[in-house]
């Protein structure tokens, strides 16, 4: 199985300006992300960016990059342009790794790509991890996902799903008699596998009302009838970088 890792990166960030170029132990963060991705079995890893500064920094560290337009309304549009620039075919698989995940597990990248390859009925794949703390279930910044019997996504939400009616807001998965037989809540991990043909189609689909309500782009795929396969990982995902505090924590791993 061959697949390509694409890492979208742009300098505009409201909470952390110039985030992709933030220094992490002598290399920009986007380079650290690419270096982790290059430890996967991907045939190639490419940064997709609208910044010549990012292109130059990647080149200095031997990381492939492609220059895209600056006016893309979403990361999906940027990835679709990158697929065309790279000459990828519609049946090829790409994995979208976020440019602010310098601790991404290479094995997780492989798992997401492999799952999509094994599920021809799905247009996308992603990952999830079990939730252990009630605070995370209730936190709207922690996106939850519920699955069907084949581990295909039924819905993603910022609200606590599933809602356990009989447990009065308590962590039912800690109930040794009844709750342990029920599904644990799952936290969505923001990594996506796409078939290139669908990735090219995705930006042309009208935004879904539920997507706008939840501010979750993946709901557009479900709304329009496309399936998303979900890999459940036993390893908690490494921390992403959205704020200066996140950056300080992540830098500890790159002395």
From Swiss-Prot:
Recorded metabolic or biological pathway in which this protein acts: Nucleotide-sugar biosynthesis; CMP-3-deoxy-D-manno-octulosonate biosynthesis; CMP-3-deoxy-D-manno-octulosonate from 3-deoxy-D-manno-octulosonate and CTP: step 1/1; Bacterial outer membrane biogenesis; lipopolysaccharide biosynthesis
Coiled-coil portions: none
SUPFAM superfamilies to which the protein is assigned, alphabetical: Nucleotide-diphospho-sugar transferases (SSF53448)
Signal peptide: none
Localization annotation: Cytoplasm
E.C. no: 2.7.7.38
Catalyzed reaction equations: 3-deoxy-alpha-D-manno-oct-2-ulosonate + CTP = CMP-3-deoxy-beta-D-manno-octulosonate + diphosphate
GO biological process assignments: CMP-keto-3-deoxy-D-manno-octulosonic acid biosynthetic process; lipopolysaccharide biosynthetic process
Any Gene Ontology CC annotation: cytosol
Gene3D superfamilies xref list: Spore Coat Polysaccharide Biosynthesis Protein SpsA, Chain A
GO molecular function, one term: 3-deoxy-manno-octulosonate cytidylyltransferase activity
Annotated CDD domains: CMP-KDO-Synthetase
Keyword annotations: Cytoplasm, Lipopolysaccharide biosynthesis, Nucleotidyltransferase, Transferase
Main location: cytoplasm
One Pfam family cited in the UniProt record for this chain: CTP_transf_3
General function of this protein: Activates KDO (a required 8-carbon sugar) for incorporation into bacterial lipopolysaccharide in Gram-negative bacteria.
Similarity remark: Belongs to the KdsB family.
Annotated PANTHER family: 3-DEOXY-MANNO-OCTULOSONATE CYTIDYLYLTRANSFERASE, 3-DEOXY-MANNO-OCTULOSONATE CYTIDYLYLTRANSFERASE, MITOCHONDRIAL
UniProt protein name: 3-deoxy-manno-octulosonate cytidylyltransferase
Organism: Polaromonas sp. (strain JS666 / ATCC BAA-500)
Gene name of the record: kdsB
């Amino acid at each position: 199985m061959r697949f390509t890792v694409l890492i979208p990166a742009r300098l505009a960030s409201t909470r952390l300006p110039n985030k992709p170029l933030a220094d992490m132990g002598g290399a920009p963060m986007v380079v650290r992300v690419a270096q982790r991705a290059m430890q996967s079995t991907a045939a190639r890893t490419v940064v997709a960016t609208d910044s010549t500064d990012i292109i130059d920094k990647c080149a200095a560290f031997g990381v492939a990059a492609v220059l895209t337009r600056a006016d893309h309304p979403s990361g999906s549009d940027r990835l679709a342009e990158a697929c065309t620039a790279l000459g990828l075919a519609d049946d090829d698989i790409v994995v979208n790794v976020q440019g602010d995940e310098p601790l991404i597990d290479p094995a997780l990248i492989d798992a997401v790509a492999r799952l999509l390859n094994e599920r021809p009925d799905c247009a996308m794949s992603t990952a999830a991890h079990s939730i252990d703390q009630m605070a995370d279930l209730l936190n709207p910044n922690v996106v939850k996902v519920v699955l069907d019997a084949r581990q295909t996504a039924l819905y993603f939400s910022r609200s606590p799903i599933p809602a356990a009616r009989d447990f009065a807001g308590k962590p039912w998965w800690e109930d040794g008699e009844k709750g342990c037989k029920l599904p644990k809540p799952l936290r969505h991990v923001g990594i996506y596998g796409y078939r290139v043909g669908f990735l090219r189609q995705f930006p042309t689909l009208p935004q879904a009302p539920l997507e706008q309500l939840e501010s979750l782009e993946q709901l557009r795929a479900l709304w329009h009838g496309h399936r998303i396969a979900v890999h459940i990982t036993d390893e908690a995902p490494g921390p992403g970088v959205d704020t200066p505090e996140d950056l300080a924590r992540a830098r500890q791993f790159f002395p």
